[in-house]
């Protein structure tokens, strides 16, 4: 009875348009040859990517944008990791912009992290040039001046003639049709870049929506909505965002029913697409998006859903034995790609060092976390994708959206704190219809909490994965010297306070590092 009441309360808090979703699981894959209205040039580009058919979520979105739906409603997608959400919005946007008369910024894709934004840009880069579209990025990978030179086209000047800079700014044009951006750098261009305008924007994609709505990110969303609001919209406002009084160089706002350069042409409304594997159902957050008759697409009836071919497994051990169990797993997967997730940047660094101190030539681990600079993260991720390294030890910087082909195993070295964290971590494997496994290392006191987490994500089965005791005994002998090397490294690098904290963790078994000796050896 209590459970029924809880479910009813949760249902009452859901916005009405989410109560009757389109179930994507009822849609079948569709071969490119039978996909209606697909531009032949885009078909060729997709085939060059090795794509011969579209996944269900991609087919469903296509029919609501290019097909009978005709983008009459804003699209909201809640679909498992690895189901193909990026191409589900990239393909129809590129198809619709292929016939654009002149180049100007018409599509904006916003993502929470630089790594994810660069990955999405790669998808657009693979298909947009086939129909003559240009794609830019504003993610902070290069200097602001370098980005401006790629985003803004300056007029050619006659030599020997002096020009007023204010006159030149009136003739600046966009050099891109599609922009992939992170919120911070987007706001930099809105406030400071001459010639950067959202006046002609037609499509706004908010990827990883729940994370982008969780933080303000310099009020990027209300700013974008205000700058793309027409005078017609303001007659019946449904959303009143906060916008700073001035936007630096960006003074243009969307004009009423007329597009600049095409006199008399009706100005279409701004179409929005919001996507996530764990889309929020909080009305107070969703209202910020100012959605137009939104259509909700989801896979099944649950907010959280794991990939269909994912196998969940768990290992229960003493906290101090976690590294031993971890190495035993890695030894049994020679040549298979694996991502290990930890709870913090510091644990990621120490665990990576510890694995390499074991001295096993079959285990070559690299770190991927927010503690590394962008160039080093990109380097390690590239090596992992190429297969030069098989083991990546990661913080939650890699949990959302990152797509690495061939990852067959994911290990939660530290138990995920939330159901959505588990969804995003596990989703690094079993992508694009492939099989994969997710292992979670648990201490005895975490078993009950993990069982509740599994209920939330709808996992019916997560059996214990057996490891032969003989395998553990052989690894235990090399664990102690490896741990001693790690302690020496930490003490040589860390300040006095850090050394004291590490000694304290080693004595008390603090779960922040979980890299202390087995109790039998303590």
Curated annotation (Swiss-Prot):
Residues reported in the UniProt entry to bind ATP: 79-86
Residue interval(s) of motif Q motif: 30-59
Domain of life of the source: Eukaryota
Region named Disordered: 490-522
Catalytic activity: ATP + H2O = ADP + phosphate + H(+)
Domain Helicase ATP-binding, first and last residues per copy: 66-297
InterPro entries in alphabetical order: DEAD/DEAH_box_helicase_dom, Helicase_ATP-bd, Helicase_C-like, P-loop_NTPase
Gene Ontology molecular function: any one: DEAD/H-box RNA helicase binding
Keyword Glycoprotein listed: no
Keywords for this protein: ATP-binding, Helicase, Hydrolase, Nucleotide-binding, RNA-binding
Occurrences of domain Helicase C-terminal (ranges): 325-475
Record motif DEAD box, residues: 207-210
PROSITE patterns: HELICASE_ATP_BIND_1, HELICASE_CTER
Biased composition annotated in UniProt, kind: Basic residues: 497-506
The keyword ATP-binding appears for this protein: yes
Known EC number: 3.6.4.13
Similarity field: Belongs to the DEAD box helicase family. DDX51/DBP6 subfamily.
Entry text on domains: The Q motif is unique to and characteristic of the DEAD box family of RNA helicases and controls ATP binding and hydrolysis.
Protein name as catalogued: DEAD-box ATP-dependent RNA helicase 1
Organism: Arabidopsis thaliana
